[in-house]
């Protein structure tokens, strides 16, 4: 019995359905008894064309292969998506579930919890769906978004490093973006450790979000901020509250803007350039420029009308002389340096810096100040001189340190005080004191401390070859020659007897005619006791001698046991003021009230002091 439904069902593809696979049917009739009949019938058969010997047509087998490969590729892509991408439901789960992973997954930013339903959510539903669709498409096309952002900055740095000259490339980008050269706005600092309050910084390829955040983060550091972003360059003018070096500024901006040092140029601005000041001033009016704080003084000076008027003021030499006189600047280098420092606040100092004859003005100013000081000194008595010099000494000391040291050297203090009184008043043949003794007894320390507090002058016999080595005697109330040797004693014995007598002598001065003066009180220190030298017997009556036989004592910390300081001498003079016959300053007009100093410039009645 046969079954018509028997056979193997096969779903052939298109192009392969010209034949079918058939299975032989089973029959109960056995052929064992019909073998003779089979042989008798011969080779003839009722089935014809059982085997097709014709050429086979190719059909659509190639298209089938392409479809199979496409399906296999889609399956592999789906497996990769399941591995590296998460569905929207997974993105909304708690962060704790994500931490339970075998390998790290790079996901886009997600919410911590499910969004609550509400009216606002329904309004934004269409926008959210559109945004989700765009996010999925972007992720599927480019891979992981955070990974791309992470390598963006590194790619920029690599591009810069590929340049043979990074600075030249940044300068070209800057000029292309802002239309002006970076070096036209700045002055160059060779050292990165030099400090300045104002800095011009330009950066390449900074993210917009970080630029916006820097506007708030820099407020605590800067008094004035000027910011303009012209992609890909960003320009800052930062006026810090305190001076900073290039290294400090670079580290600050690298932390705030997340940039590398190769993306940055930092130099101080040109403070005296009109074009540079106008660039910052007019740029602050641009709506695309962020400016916060008051304009720096150097911008106002060159842009505002009132500052321009002040800048046009002619230089007044008398104002400069008055400044040097009031501050007791007698040397040319001191006058030039300290007056130039006033250029930020003083119009006359600013005019001085803009003048082409600064060296001549400084020289003339120093000459005039010395003339005024010399005239003032000659008018003063020794009491007024000592009083003026002690007023500038600050701090407390004790007069006993001076007295103890004198007694330590086995000197009668009453005798010393009497001779010192005559010495200060410059009495004839009493105006020279010699302190002699072996080395390390404190001779130079004692005399130098006195010269320092009374602003005396020191003469060096090494300059005796010059005709002008005694010239400082004309500009002081007290002088010192330290470490007098036999050669110096010979010179004193031959040429300075009249001066030690207290008589008027002719003193040769450099670049001036010789002048008539009396020697001021003169201190001498020596290892030679001139009183025991018979060949200098003519000096015995002109010199008052004290011996320092004992070595100066020091404590265990190598500190002097006797403090011969300015404060000690101030206390000494104040304590023994009347014993030294120094006049009362109230009688000379100094009653403790502030007095008008010497005026060498024409001041306005209501002008500044």
UniProtKB/Swiss-Prot annotation:
Enzyme Commission code(s) on record: 5.6.2.4
Cross-linked sites for Glycyl lysine isopeptide (Lys-Gly) (interchain with G-Cter in SUMO): 518
Keywords, in A-Z order: ATP-binding, DNA replication, DNA-binding, Early protein, Helicase, Host nucleus, Hydrolase, Isomerase, Isopeptide bond, Nucleotide-binding, Phosphoprotein, Ubl conjugation
GO terms under cellular component: host cell nucleus
Residues in SF3 helicase domain copies: 411-561
Catalytic activity annotation: Couples ATP hydrolysis with the unwinding of duplex DNA by translocating in the 3'-5' direction; ATP + H2O = ADP + phosphate + H(+)
Modified residues (Phosphoserine): 87, 94
Region (DNA-binding region): 149-312
Pfam families cross-referenced by the UniProt entry: PPV_E1_C, PPV_E1_DBD, PPV_E1_N
UniProt region (Disordered), positions on chain: 584-609
UniProt main location, coarse: host cell
Subcellular location per the Swiss-Prot or TrEMBL entry: Host nucleus
Binding site residues for ATP: 437-444
Subunit structure as annotated in this protein's UniProt entry: Can form hexamers. Interacts with E2 protein; this interaction increases E1 DNA binding specificity. Interacts with host DNA polymerase subunit POLA2. Interacts with host single stranded DNA-binding protein RPA1. Interacts with host TOP1; this interaction stimulates the enzymatic activity of TOP1.
Role this protein plays: ATP-dependent DNA 3'-5' helicase required for initiation of viral DNA replication. It forms a complex with the viral E2 protein. The E1-E2 complex binds to the replication origin which contains binding sites for both proteins. During the initial step, a dimer of E1 interacts with a dimer of protein E2 leading to a complex that binds the viral origin of replication with high specificity. Then, a second dimer of E1 displaces the E2 dimer in an ATP-dependent manner to form the E1 tetramer.
Protein name from the UniProt record: Replication protein E1
């Amino acid at each position: 019995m046969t079954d018509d439904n028997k056979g193997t069902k096969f779903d052939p593809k298109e192009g392969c359905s010209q034949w079918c696979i058939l299975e032989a049917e089973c029959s109960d009739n056995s052929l064992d008894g019909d073998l003779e009949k089979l042989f008798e019938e011969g080779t003839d058969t009722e089935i014809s064309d059982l085997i097709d010997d014709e050429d086979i047509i190719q059909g659509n087998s190639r298209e089938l292969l392409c479809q199979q490969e496409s399906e296999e590729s889609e399956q592999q892509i789906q497996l990769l998506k399941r591995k590296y991408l998460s569905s929207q439901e997974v993105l909304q789960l708690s962060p704790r579930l994500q931490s339970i992973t075998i390998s790290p997954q790079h996901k886009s930013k997600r919410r911590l919890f499910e969004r609550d339903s509400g009216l606002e959510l329904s309004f934004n539903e269409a926008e959210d769906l559109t945004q989700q669709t765009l996010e999925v498409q972007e992720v599927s096309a480019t891979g992981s978004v955070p990974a791309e952002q992470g390598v963006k900055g590194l790619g920029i740095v690599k591009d810069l490093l590929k340049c043979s000259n990074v600075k030249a490339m940044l300068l070209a980008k800057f000029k292309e973006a802002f239309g002006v050269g970076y070096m036209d706005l700045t002055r160059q600092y060779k050292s990165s450790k030099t400090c300045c309050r104002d800095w011009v910084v330009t950066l390449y390829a900074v993210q917009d979000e970080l630029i916006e955040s820097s506007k708030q983060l820099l407020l605590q550091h800067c008094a004035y901020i000027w910011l303009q972003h012209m992609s890909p360059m960003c320009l800052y003018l930062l006026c810090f509250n305190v001076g900073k070096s290039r290294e400090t500024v670079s580290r600050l901006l690298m932390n705030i803007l997340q940039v590398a040092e190769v993306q940055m140029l930092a130099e101080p601005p040109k403070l005296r350039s009109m074009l540079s000041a106008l660039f910052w001033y007019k740029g602050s009016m641009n709506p695309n420029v962020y400016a916060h704080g008051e304009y720096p003084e150097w911008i106002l000076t060159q842009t505002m009308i009132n500052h321009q008027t002040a800048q046009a003021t002619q230089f007044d030499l008398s104002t400069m002389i008055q400044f040097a006189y009031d501050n007791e600047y007698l040397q040319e280098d001191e006058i030039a340096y300290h007056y130039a420092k006033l250029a930020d606040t003083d119009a006359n100092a600013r005019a001085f810096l803009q003048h082409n004859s600064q060296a001549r003005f400084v020289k003339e100013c120093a000459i005039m100040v010395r003339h005024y000081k010399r005239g003032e000194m000659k008018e003063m008595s020794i009491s007024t001189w000592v009083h003026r010099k002690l007023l500038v000494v600050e701090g407390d000391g004790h007069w006993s340190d001076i007295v103890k040291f004198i007694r330590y050297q086995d000197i009668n203090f009453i005798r010393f005080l009497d001779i010192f009184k005559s010495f200060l008043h410059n009495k004839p043949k009493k105006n020279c004191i010699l302190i002699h003794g072996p080395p390390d007894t404190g001779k130079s320390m004692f005399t130098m401390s006195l010269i320092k507090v009374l602003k005396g002058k020191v003469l060096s016999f090494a300059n005796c070859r010059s005709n002008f080595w005694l010239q400082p005697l004309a500009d002081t109330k007290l002088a010192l020659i330290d470490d007098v040797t036999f050669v110096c004693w010979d010179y004193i014995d031959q040429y300075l007897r009249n001066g030690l007598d207290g008589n008027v002598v002719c003193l040769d001065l450099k670049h001036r005619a010789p002048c008539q003066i009396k020697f001021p009180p003169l201190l001498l220190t020596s290892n030679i006791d001139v009183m025991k030298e018979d060949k200098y017997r003519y000096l015995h009556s002109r010199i008052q001698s004290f011996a320092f036989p004992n070595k100066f004592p020091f404590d265990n910390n190598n500190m002097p046991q006797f403090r011969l300081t300015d404060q000690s001498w101030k206390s000494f003079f104040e304590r023994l003021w009347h014993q030294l016959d120094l006049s009362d300053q109230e009688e000379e007009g100094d009653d403790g009230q502030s007095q008008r100093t010497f005026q060498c410039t024409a001041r306005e009645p209501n002008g500044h002091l």
